[in-house]
Every structure is written in C-alpha cells, then in structure tokens.
C-alpha cells in the first residue's frame, strides 16, 4: 500500500508542470520576426496585442502582462489570450 501511495505521489509530481510560464511575441511594429518569443515573468499570465492609429499608420505592440491591458487613449483594439504564441 505504501508503495502504491508513493508511486501515485511521484507520478503526480512528474505530470504537473509547476514551473510553466507563458511565451509571447514581444515587438512594437506591424509584424514580428518569425520565432521571436519571450518567456514571460512568472506573474504574467496573458499575452496581449494592442493596435492604434498614428500619423505614420497603424502601430502594433505585443507582449506579456499580469492582467489584460485596457485600451489606451489611442487604442483601437486589444487582444488578450492565455496560450503560448497566441498574440
């Protein structure tokens, strides 16, 4: 019985990904370079993409965030997501 309990504990620890962190695109332009992902800090649970218009055209910022950012004064669109490379 003790062996079974120990086995279950070990399997549970192995199956849990206790150190998982998000990976998001990080860039401040219209497009990101392929494969350019950043490992977010442990408290950052969201990837975001915000776009807004300025004199030179539409700008896009992508990154990691602890909470979903609200649109700025100039913000047209904010996308928040919780899976790797979703922004």
Swiss-Prot record:
Binds and inhibits muscular and neuronal nicotinic acetylcholine receptors (nAChR). Is a reversible antagonist of muscle nAChR (alpha-1-beta-1-delta-epsilon/CHRNA1-CHRNB1-CHRND-CHRNE) (IC(50)=10 nM) and a potent and poorly reversible antagonist of the neuronal alpha-7/CHRNA7 nAChR (IC(50)=50 nM). May exhibit differential affinities for the two binding sites on the muscle nAChR. SUPFAM superfamilies: Snake toxin-like. GO terms for molecular function: acetylcholine receptor inhibitor activity; ion channel regulator activity; toxin activity. Keywords: Acetylcholine receptor inhibiting toxin, Disulfide bond, Ion channel impairing toxin, Neurotoxin, Postsynaptic neurotoxin, Secreted, Signal, Toxin. It holds the Pfam family Toxin_cobra-type. It comes from Bungarus candidus (Malayan krait). One of its GO terms (cellular component) is extracellular region. Expressed by the venom gland. Gene3D superfamilies: CD59 (2.10.60.10). This is Candoxin. It is found in: Secreted. Belongs to the three-finger toxin family. Ancestral subfamily. Orphan group IV sub-subfamily. The keyword Zinc-finger does not apply. The keyword Secreted applies. Disulfide bonds join 24-47, 27-32, 40-64, 68-80, 81-86. The lineage of its organism: Eukaryota, Metazoa, Chordata, Craniata, Vertebrata. Residues 1-21 form the signal peptide.
